[in-house]
Amino acid sequence: MSSVDSAPVIHVLHENPDWFGPFQAAFEAAGVPYREWLLVDGVLDLDEAPPAGIYWSRISASAHTRGHGLSKDYTRSVLNWLDAYGARTVNGRRTIELEMSKVDQLTRLRAQGFDVPLTRVVVGTHLLVAAAEGFPTPFITKHNQGGKGLGVQKFDSAAELAAAIAAGDYEEPEDGISLLQEFVVAARPEVTRVEIIGDEFIYAITADTARGGFQLCPADACAIDPTTGALLLPPGATIQPEVGQHIFALREGFDHPIIDRYRAFLRAEGIEVAGIEFIETADGRVVTYDVNTNTNYNAQIEASAPRSGPGAIADYLAALLADAYPSAR
């Protein structure tokens, strides 16, 4: 990236143009100057100072599924460079490590007293079956590094897992790390996702797990087969989604104490934009299981929500830009 253009802007670090549309629209509607930086490949001059502005990272742990396996380490390099020059980042260097590791997420959540699923971390697929022996059943497997339900499968026994691996039906994780995890039974077939931007609660949504399964990405692009344009049957879903049906719904009037606990968690971890997901069980548990730091927003939810997620991000970043560069107002 060249620093020839010195006007301060919001620099958006990302790798998936399919997810950027709502944010582009929000920036343009609010008159916020921005520049996309697609971290797919490129050249980084460590001796050149970064251009003026605020840097917002939206790199996803699922980047490798789009052929962008280099994006993760490229982003780490860019964020190290930005930190070295004192640039202001949003969801910066620490955040990308939490985004890339569910082990990191779960250990940090547990350290702050959240109820998280019983989990066993397995490095090397050849150790999975042995690790599953004696683990409470049913259980799920999950990739440490990923999103969109990557590697999530439900098994009723270690023998069933062994058969799946032998048949070639177990997808190898990108970083070689799998999670064996308690299958948390929800009181209703839904999970809740809490959206927080700049330490403010924006809204909460529910996701229908009967139709959404383990793939609960709110972005509209996640629900469509990119080749055929047909609705996908997500892994773990028990009901085929149909045109006109909505997996996501606004959870109106949500005012749970967990909101303030999530805000405190994000402050402690230095995360400024996130969606955190939890399951409520019939016996009263509130089980937090995922922290999404490159959060997407669903168009149907946005149409009825009291606040816009992308709009709130545009406003938050614009305020940071104005504070950092008052002469540019």
Where are these regions (language model features)?
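Extreme N-terminal starter segment of soluble prokaryotic enzymes
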Residues: 5-11
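Short hydrophobic segments within beta-strands
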Residues: 12-13, 197
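Conserved N-proximal alpha/beta basic substrate-recognition cap immediately N-terminal to
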Residues: 15-118
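Short glycine-rich anion-binding loops that position phosphate/pyrophosphate groups of nucleotides
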Residues: 60-63, 144-146, 294
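Protein kinase-like catalytic core scaffold
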Residues: 139, 202-203, 274, 287-289
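Phosphate-binding site of ATP-dependent enzymes
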Residues: 156-266
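C-terminal active-site "lid" helix and adjoining low-complexity regulatory extension at the edge
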Residues: 249-253, 266-273, 280-329
